[in-house]
Amino acid sequence: MKIFKIFLLCLFLCFMQSCGESGIETIIPENEQENNPSDSHEGQNGTPSDDDTKSKTLKILAIGNSFTEDGIAYLPSLVRNAGIKNVTIAKMVIGGTSLLSHHTHAIKDDSVYNFSISKDGSFKSQGKKKFSDCLLSDTWDYVILQQVSQHSGLYRTYQPYLNNLINIIHSYYPQAIIGWQMTWAYSSTSSHTGFKNYDNNQTIMYESILDAVNQMKTETGITVIIPTGIVIQELRGTNINNYFELTRDGYHLDYGAGRYAAACTWFETLIRPIFQIGIKGNTLRANSGNVPVTDEVALLCQEIAENVVKKYYGNKEN
């Protein structure tokens, strides 16, 4: 009887330990666009202590369109889940806007940007703002740009607007590091009218994007590249790929695995080098989209994002 009681006690203790170690945080969306993550910070491999991170800060401003929103939708939640503090992530976006249009709005300085800021794990709208309002709202470490998707593989559409935007941004903050989100190719069956720029061929579009970004790096000196497009293309070769090829409409990213993988890529590129903690082991999940982020899907997205970023930067911290 005594041995039996000891056995029951051991079972009970094991059960309590397993309950305390699960630490899975799941995003339960109010709808497919707005998400309300919980506040669990458990389960992240190598989570830094408050003493490790309280002296470090990072401020990221993303300028773009709906592809920008796809890229960073889950980034604040991933950062919070990792137990990382003192990170400000902001986005100033206009749907379907190209570098040419951003340059025009920067010159006119009209109140057309949908501006949102996250300091605690979720974006909060600041309403319509001018280009200058957004830039002057904080002292940004990184300002991330991108081209509109249909022109992302056509470098001739980047200039002179990209160089002009860089000069304008540096007139506000000379020390800001300019970065670039490499966007993704459309699905093979995409109906986007801009797909004709690439003969309605995903491979041609993908390779054109790679070529354009390489030319941009050479001509502008931009070295901080967020290789979202490579990560999405790699995932399309795995068993989680679907008819829409990780998009929700042939071009915007799926609300589940697509957006999650993109945010993992941003995390590995910008967050890891500063805070010395990677995405691998992050317990954030997303029960949305055509490819929900289960434990298996999350691990795959994390591993591919980590590997792609390491390979892109030659296994060095960017």
Question: Locations of the language-model features?
Answer:
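Positively charged n-region of N-terminal signal peptides that target proteins for export
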Residues: 1-5
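Residues that mark the start of a beta-strand
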Residues: 57-61, 88
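Conserved catalytic region of serine esterases and O-acyltransferases that act on ester linkages
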Residues: 250-253, 257-318
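Bacterial N-terminal signal peptides
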Residues: 7-17
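Short hydrophobic segments within beta-strands
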Residues: 61-63, 92, 181
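Bacterial Sec-dependent N-terminal signal peptides
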Residues: 15-54
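Conserved SGNH/GDSL esterase-like catalytic core that processes O-acyl groups on lipids
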Residues: 70-158
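Alpha-helical cap/lid subdomain in secreted, periplasmic
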Residues: 128-256, 268
